[in-house]
UniProtKB/Swiss-Prot annotation:
Similarity comment: Belongs to the noggin family.
Organism: Danio rerio (Zebrafish)
Glycosylated residues in this chain: N60, N93
PANTHER family: BONE MORPHOGENETIC PROTEIN INHIBITOR, NOGGIN, NOGGIN
Pfam families to which the protein is assigned, alphabetical: Noggin
Name of the protein: Noggin-3
Subunit structure: Homodimer; disulfide-linked.
Length: 223
């Protein structure tokens, strides 16, 4: 879809202005649903003692793949440092963001939206123009999940996971005020090296754990 001329964006803002009061976030509910809670951020706290690290004999790929089984997801996991590990939100510019068009069914709030052209005499836009404005608004309020590779350290296997974050370099609403936030997460199952002190000494083993990752971003109030 070609870029909408500036006056069309102005038309959109004036049209929405009758429905949305700038600075009052509750009025933005017409555009996007608000998540009921926030996604907790995982903070890994590890004892730095190298005695607790897995040894080379504990990192047999064949054995670890057998333990992890079908939970190994090659699109989101890597044993070796990924080549594009630095590709993430910092490198994603506005033009690249707009290329990540939303797909699926247009939100009913946007599909039902009407627009008034404030250019001379007030009148309704054509069906084609209305459709272009709806697509522009849908694309502008779309919140993509930006993926980057994260190194979990040598006490996790696979060591590298592709995790998500929400694009937040600009507001996702018209007028401005709302931001992209994660409403929910999914989980990846990985192996964690766990050591426990027993009577006979230190006992260590790989155990399966679930690691939460952001799977969706939505336009919502900042607080």
């Amino acid at each position: 879809m070609d870029n909408i001329p500036y006056f069309l964006a102005t038309v959109l803002i004036f049209s929405l202005g009758f429905r949305i009061e700038e600075g009052m976030c509750q009025h933005y509910y017409l555009l996007r649903p608000i998540p009921s809670d926030s996604l907790p951020i995982v903070e890994l706290k590890e004892d730095p003692d190298p005695v607790l690290d897995p040894k080379e004999r504990d990192l047999n790929e064949t054995e670890l793949r057998a333990i992890l089984g079908s939970h190994f997801e090659q699109n989101f996991m890597s044993i070796n440092p990924p080549e594009d590990k630095h590709a993430g939100q910092d490198e994603l510019n506005e033009s690249e963001l707009m290329k990540q068009r939303p797909n699926g069914i247009m939100p009913k709030e946007i599909k039902a939206m009407e627009f008034d052209i404030q250019h001379g005499k007030k009148h309704k836009p054509s069906k084609k123009l209305r459709r272009r404005l709806q697509l522009w608004l849908w694309s502008y309020t779309f919140c993509p999940v930006v993926h980057t590779w994260q190194d979990l350290g040598n006490r996790f296997w696979p060591r590298y996971l592709k995790v998500g974050s929400c694009y937040n370099k600009r507001s996702c609403s018209v007028p401005e005020g709302m931001v992209c936030k994660p409403p929910k997460s999914s989980h990846l199952t990985v192996l964690r090296w766990r050591c426990v002190q027993r009577k006979g000494g230190l006992k260590c083993a790989w155990i399966p754990v679930q690691y939460p990752v952001i799977s969706e971003c939505k336009c919502s109030c900042p607080n």
